[in-house]
A protein has these predicted regions:
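ATP-binding N-terminal substructure of ATP-dependent carboxylate-amine bond-forming enzymes
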Residues: 1-98, 104-105, 109-111, 115, ...
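Basic phosphate/pyrophosphate-binding loop/patch that engages nucleotide-derived ligands
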Residues: 119-127
Length: 127
């Protein structure tokens, strides 16, 4: 199986003056990505890492179309916006590429903690 590993590397994250030191703590390191790719390859799969960014120089959409993965192993966090974790899955759905992890709506909802709490309480789940 041909697998595209999608993530955001901390070293590639945007930076600006005055940003918090822990702004990108949830992003990944090259060591983590190398371990995931190696584990997939040891299982007999072809695996390649792609920076989860549609903008140049990363050009994720064009690179995925060229690679034609059977599956996208998605651990992308995104960089901006309330639904940042849902952005790459939304792109993958538009490209009709299967991916691991939660669906777009679930990821977007989970980042909105007050709305998530209201939905859970509505369904009788304590928070």
């Amino acid at each position: 199986m041909r697998i595209a590993v999608l993530a955001n590397l901390k070293i590639n994250a945007p930076r600006w003056e005055g940003m918090s030191e822990d702004q990108w703590d949830d992003l990944d390191s090259p060591k983590t990505i190398d371990s995931i790719v190696a584990a997939l390859q040891s299982g007999g799969h072809e695996a390649q890492f792609f920076e989860a960014n549609i903008l140049p120089p990363h050009n994720l959409i064009e690179r995925l179309e060229a690679y034609q993965p059977d599956l996208c192993f998605n651990i992308a966090e995104g960089h901006f916006g309330n639904g940042r974790e849902a952005q790459i899955p939304a792109v993958l759905e538009m490209l009709r590429l299967p991916y691991t992890g939660s669906q777009v709506l679930t990821l977007a909802l989970a980042l909105d903690k007050p709305l998530t709490k209201r939905v859970l309480l509505y369904h009788g789940l304590p928070t």
